[in-house]
Amino acid sequence: MRRRAFSFAVFLAFAVAGQTISSQAVSDRPADVRTAFARAQHLKHGINASEWFAQSANDYSAARTNRYTDAADVALMAKLGFDNVRLSIDATPLEGWPHGADGLNSEFLGRLDKAVDAMLANGLAVTIDLHPESSYKEKVRTTSEGVDRLVMLWRRLAAHYATRDPERVFFEIMNEPEVSDPYRWAGIQARVAAAIREAAPRNTIIATGPNYSDIQDLLTQQPLADGNVIYNFHFYDPHEFTHQGAGWGSAWWSYTHGIPYPATESSMPDLVKEVPDAATRFQLERYWLDHWDAHRIRLTIDEAAAWGKTNNVPLICNEFGVYREHADEQSRMNWIRDVRTAFEADGIGWAMWDYRGGFGVVWKDDGQPAKVDEKVVEALGLAK
C-alpha cells in the first residue's frame, strides 16, 4: 500500500500494446474459469491482516507475532461478518533458518500454519499474500536471479499449503510488484503462476498488474493461460484524501489534515488558503476541482469491471481504505461506503486495508482485546 506514480502517455502506449501481452484465449479453459468465478464468492467481504507476518522486518519473533494478532482477533474477524482474510507474509523470513525439509523456515512457517488453520476453523477463506519488502522486489525487477528466487519460494510455499482446502486457500503472486514494465511483469507473473500450478494443481491463484496494482496497471495486462485465476487491483483514489497526514509516500501528505470527502464549494476554499506552500496548495486544488464523489468513484471502478467482463475473469479489490489518524471521521466513512458500494454494484469482492493498523477497523494494543470501530463496520455494510 504505497504512493502511485503513473504517466498517462505511458498508459496509453501500453493499453494498445497490451493486446500483445500473451495468453491463450480464455475460451480454451472454460472449466477452470468457472472454478475461479465460483471461488471468488468466498472473497466478497474481506479484511487485511497486515503488519503481523509482513511489514515488520525488524521483528518477526514469536513474542511479537503471538501478541500482535491472536486467536481472539481471528474469531472477531469472522464475528464481524468478514468472509476472508488476506494474510500478508514477508518473503525474507520464509527463506531464513532453520530450514525444514521443504526448504522453508520451519519455525516461522509453524506460526503461519497456526494462523491459517485458525482462520479456516472460523469459516474464513485465506489469501496467502506474498508481501515482500521493496528491496526484495527490486531484485525481482532487475535481475534474473531475483525472479528465480521468487519462483522457487512460491514452488515451496504452494506445495506446503496445497494440503489445505483448495476451495478456501488462495495464492496471491505478489503484493504491489513495483515492476514498472508491464511486459516484464507479465512474463514474471506467468512463470510464477506456472510454478504454483505445478505444486498446487487445485488452488486458485490471485494475479495482479505491475507497479502498485492500481486499476490502470491492471488494464495493461491480458489474462494468464491458466484459467483458475482471480485478478486483483488496489484502490486508494484520490490519494490526496486517503493518505492525508501519512508519513510515507509523497512528502506533502504529512502536512495535510482534515481534508473532506466529498469536497464541496463550502468546505475547500478555506482549507486551501491555510496551506502555505504552492505545491501542496496545487495538490489540494486539483483534488477539489476533480470533483471526487460517489459518482466519480463508481465510474473509475467501472473501468476495472469492464476489463474483467471483456476478459471473462473474476475480479477482486483486496486493498482499499483511508488513513485514519488525520482524516475527518465522517468523511472517512463516506469514502469507505462509496467505494464498497461501487465494488458491490459491479460484483467485485473486496478486502479492506486493514484490521488493526493505521487504516483499521479496530483499535488494539499488543496482547489486549480489540475495540471495534462500529462506524467502519457499518460503512462496510456488515452491521446487523
Protein language model features and the residues they cover:
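Aromatic-rich peripheral "rim/lid" segments of glycoside hydrolase catalytic domains that contact
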Residues: 325-384
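Structural motif corresponding to alpha-helix initiation and N-cap regions
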Residues: 30, 67-71, 298-301, 333-336
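Active-site mouth of glycoside hydrolases
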Residues: 28-204, 209-218, 228, 359, ...
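Active-site region of glycoside hydrolase catalytic domains
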Residues: 26, 33-37, 148-293, 302-322, ...
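Hydrophobic beta-strand scaffold residues
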Residues: 126-128, 315, 350
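Bacterial N-terminal signal peptides
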Residues: 7-17
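Positively charged n-region of N-terminal signal peptides that target proteins for export
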Residues: 1-4
